[in-house]
Amino acid sequence: MIEKNWQELIRPMKPEIEPGHDPARQAKIVAEPLERGFGMTLGNALRRVLLSSLQGAAVTNVHIDGVVHEFSSIDGVREDVTDIVLNIKQIALRMHGEGPKRVVLKKSGPGIVTAGDIEETADVEIVNKDLALCTLDEGAEIRMEFTINTGKGYVPSERNRPEDAPIGLIGVDALYSPVKRVSYKVENTREGQVLDYDKLTLEVETDGTVTPEDSVAFAARILQDQFQIFINFEEAVEARPAEDDKPELDFNPALLRKVDELELSVRSANCLKNDNIVYIGDLIQKSEAEMLRTPNFGRKSLNEIKEVLAQMGLHLGMEAPNWPPENIEDLAKRFEDHV
């Protein structure tokens, strides 16, 4: 059966999100277990797409009143126009709808002009409002009109200044990608008694216009869409086994549930994972004394697990005849509606 090419590969659990110092911009996304070699394959593909192919919005050109070209200076403004344009490139924004759109900034001195001084519209939202653009002296004024568009990747300033552009329109390098940095690492992890599966950790930093978790989801969707063209067959729909076809079990089907499906605290869940306790059937055979010998597992975690098991009519120290079954993963899928 051709379906075995993909159905018999191990599939990772739902990715674990580890927020960074600024959760809206930084996070680690962890996926495990993966077939050996898949960590590098998926990590490299996702990284390339994250950095090159996600849509974003950016300033494409700017007109500053009284300025003829980008090598000018402005009376009462401490920065020259070149520095102002460099700062404009760092504006992070969201655009709702199609571009291009225009927004205006007007301010009088003294004081610092920030991205938050840009007059937002229903279509344009400034994310990093604290970004400094320039500094005005007493009595100085500045007015800037920005053109904003959507795109992907990098577009140089020369392409953002039309040939028939009026004097004073300055092209800006457009950095459309909302993802600023991506790195990944692949480590060994275990599943059951197998020790050489891959664990993929993606470390993603964005400009705040999209979360790291969403950016990875968008990149995965792009890859899914691109890979789809290579599939040249239709999958046969397998009939779901009838109730009478299910094998009789020598134990409670609830034992086939994985412990990571239980609503446990992070500490308790990590302790079980580190002790290679995968299924509830593995857990109930442990005594309280054995559990307390688990590193970082204390009385609070023990009471939490006892309470969860009690709600299922189970407890620690139980016997589970014929556990674990040889085809445990297959049984877990077939009995998933009953556990």
Swiss-Prot record:
It catalyses: RNA(n) + a ribonucleoside 5'-triphosphate = RNA(n+1) + diphosphate. GO terms for cellular component: cytoplasm; DNA-directed RNA polymerase complex. SUPFAM superfamilies: C-terminal domain of RNA polymerase alpha subunit (SSF47789), Insert subdomain of RNA polymerase alpha subunit (SSF56553), RBP11-like subunits of RNA polymerase (SSF55257). Gene3D superfamilies: 5' to 3' exonuclease, C-terminal subdomain, DNA-directed RNA polymerase, insert domain, RNA polymerase, RBP11-like subunit. InterPro entries: DNA-dir_RNA_pol_insert, DNA-dir_RNA_pol_RpoA/D/Rpb3, DNA-dir_RpoA, RBP11-like, RNAP_asu_C, RNApol_insert_sf. One of its GO terms (biological process) is DNA-templated transcription. Keywords: DNA-directed RNA polymerase, Nucleotidyltransferase, Transcription, Transferase. The keyword Transferase applies. Its EC number is 2.7.7.6. GO terms for molecular function: DNA binding; DNA-directed RNA polymerase activity; protein dimerization activity. The keyword Iron does not apply. It is an enzyme of class 2 (transferase). Residues 1-234 are annotated as: Alpha N-terminal domain (alpha-NTD). Residues 251-339 are annotated as: Alpha C-terminal domain (alpha-CTD). It comes from the Bacteria. NCBIfam families: PRK05182.1-2 (NF003513), PRK05182.2-5 (NF003519), rpoA (TIGR02027). The N-terminal domain is essential for RNAP assembly and basal transcription, whereas the C-terminal domain is involved in interaction with transcriptional regulators and with upstream promoter elements. DNA-dependent RNA polymerase catalyzes the transcription of DNA into RNA using the four ribonucleoside triphosphates as substrates. Belongs to the RNA polymerase alpha chain family. Homodimer. The RNAP catalytic core consists of 2 alpha, 1 beta, 1 beta' and 1 omega subunit. When a sigma factor is associated with the core the holoenzyme is formed, which can initiate transcription. This is DNA-directed RNA polymerase subunit alpha.
